[in-house]
Amino acid sequence: MIVKKMPILQGFPDFETVKFFTGKFFQKYNFTPVFYDIETTGLSRNSTYLYLIGAVGIEDETWNFYQWMAENANEEETILRIFSQFLQQCDLLISYNGDRFDQPYLEARYEKYGISSPFTGKQSLDLYLTLKPLKSLLKLSAMKQPCMEEFLGIKDRIYDNGKECIKLYKYFLKKRDAFTADEILGHNLEDVLGLGRIFDMLGYLCIYDGDYEVTYSEFDGDNLILKLKLPCTLPQEFSNGNTDFYLTGKDEEINLIIKTTDGKLKQYYADYKDYYYLPEEDTVIPKSLGSGIDRKHRKAATKNTCYTWFTCSDAFLSSPVQQKQYLTYTLSCLIGTLKNPL
């Protein structure tokens, strides 16, 4: 078995950044996270096997990178046992598509060898699932990890993709070639360190969950103009919009322009199933109040039609509290109208 360990001196988020973002998702959390990625000989949990695990954990107040690579199929069980021991002090696993592939695959292999799952009682942060809402906002061509890194301007990958790694590993088993082993380990290293690089993209989610302060507001007669301050620095600037709104983001600031209709704005509501939409009035009414309206004049509201209108008044423009209330759900609805890139 090939075993590697090295400290990570740069290119990985600092502890405070990881604490901040993971703390937004998990309240009971002792900050013993592990970033990890696995390499297998195929997708099937029953007819293929695990041959490599790469992980980043904390040791002596420093991020450290670890790898365990099997030199033959018989070493799979040993790697599984080592990783299980490694995870004993961990309370949060961070991965990319780990909830759908890595963890279920590992649990199946642990079951095969009669080993208790090390994932029991541990929390999981799957960056693929968590960052998926950003696809249209950031104009991402795909949600593959290299595409996320490309958005961030990271273009220094030099090793083969995962599918090529399977071919390389089979070649390694035949030839025992050290150069081939380094290629396989290098790919896994890039994947695991890439988790740290894209981790900062969690900052964009603050736009969705209302974690910002409104610092400026103006009405120019046609548009509501707002500036928002985020609690973190965005890793890459962005811009996007359509005929209804336009927003840009850079560093800790979001600039937002929302088109009004005769000086009025739409206020969206989350619980759309509790409302009727009235097409003739272009507004909604609670079902509890609208049951007496003729069915010809009402429809079940949808996410896109569950809104009322209000005037962009001086009172609204002078109240950051009202502006925040307006944006809390409306902004995510507006972002939801953006089209995914072709």
Spans of features found by a protein language model:
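DEDD superfamily 3′-5′ metal-dependent exonuclease/proofreading module
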Residues: 1-48, 58-342
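Short beta-strand scaffold segments in enzyme catalytic cores
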Residues: 53-55
